[in-house]
Amino acid sequence: MSVIKSIKAREILNSRGNPTVEVDLYTEKDGVVSSFRAAVPSGASTGIYEAVELRDGDKSRYLGKGVLKAIKNILEVIQPAVIGKSVSDQAAIDKLMIDLDGTPNKGKLGANAILAVSLAVCRAGAADRNLPLYKYISEIAGTKMRLPVPAFNVINGGSHAGNKLAMQEFMILPVGAKDFNEAYRMGSEVYHNLKNVISGRYGQDAINVGDEGGFAPPIQSNKEGLELLKLAIEKAGYTGLVKIGMDCAASEFKVENGYDLDFKTKNNDGSAVISGEKLGDLYREFIKEYPIISIEDPFDQDDWESYTKLTASVDIQIVGDDLLVTNPERIKTGIEKKACNALLLKVNQIGSVTESIRAALDSKNASWGVMVSHRSGETEDTFIADLVVGLGTGQIKTGAPCRSERLAKYNQLVRINEELGENHNYAGLTFRKF
């Protein structure tokens, strides 16, 4: 049995150039010491109900975004409590850390402190059982493994890019691929066709990329973004095989009297502000005109009524991210209100592996879909690739097929696909059936 011997914690930079937490967890078994590393992501568009990401607030250092407080909590509070504990009991260690924090939102120790240790413990637990991480997660969750449909974010807008596009992500989902490797290739080929379309229409300056590797062209309307995707899919030869998804991140453009589709223009005249009802009509028009199969965060995180109306009126996947923040209580409310039909699973929104698994299983029990997700501020850590296979949720979004912190996850899925061989099961058209 491997037990925790010590923890090292450090401040590293994520893909947005901001500090985040990384830990090395040291274990001992039969006199042999091993180490397991984990790093925590962070978001740009964050829901107000997310667990607390503890930052230092010292403006003279990293503009207040340092994480030395979280690191101190790992070394001085969490480490003494977990030394000698078995890494094979993920739930017990997670509960211990949550109890040490004692707040409903992990505001004392920081979700970034707790999660870093939780992820490392999970890796150590897998090694203790001599199992690949994805297989270990499958066993502790009681789920069936399968390879996910990747949702590649290929056009960036909203808070992820400097253009005027209100909605945050325009994605492609290769649901018609026969396996993950083919889906990966389809995504890459559509991405490069999109690059050619954008550069031909807007010039070379337009193919700069956003935080998640997607292009950020100077387009003015959301419909224009959908047209570009449709054309790129056609040029790649994958019409009917590659579908479209959107993450609207509507909480980012919610204003007092509605939703401002021109929110990135300061002091605008308000002519682009529409009601939740009109915004719902816009989404229904998009669904009729384009091969859209998934829309995430179509409304503000507190606009339950608009969510419920849209979900009842369409047959596509409606995903709750800021609405649910991977929180069991918010998920329960969403199920009761029939506000959406899928969860976006972000481990740092809730702050531990055990709670993330619970959120996925609660969603599964409600016949919801579950899409595992990265954050815009990522690291080279590949945990979520193993998580999505182990849970078998059938769908993952972790950016474009571009930028190393995004490709680290996709490339890990290629390796897992290879390891599983003929035993793998690509979600494909059944991606919503978790």
UniProtKB/Swiss-Prot annotation:
SMART domains cross-referenced by the UniProt entry: Enolase_C (SM01192), Enolase_N (SM01193)
GO CC list: extracellular matrix; phosphopyruvate hydratase complex
PROSITE patterns: ENOLASE
Subcellular location: Cytoplasm
Enzyme Commission numbers on file: 4.2.1.11
Note accompanying the cofactor annotation: Mg(2+) is required for catalysis and for stabilizing the dimer.
Protein's pathway: Carbohydrate degradation; glycolysis; pyruvate from D-glyceraldehyde 3-phosphate: step 4/5
Tagged with keyword Cytoplasm: yes
Enzyme class: lyase
List of catalytic residues: 212 (proton donor), 346 (proton acceptor)
Binding-site residues, substrate: 160, 169, 296, 321, 373-376, 397
Classification via PANTHER family: ENOLASE
Name recorded for this polypeptide: Enolase A
Source organism (scientific name): Dictyostelium discoideum (Social amoeba)
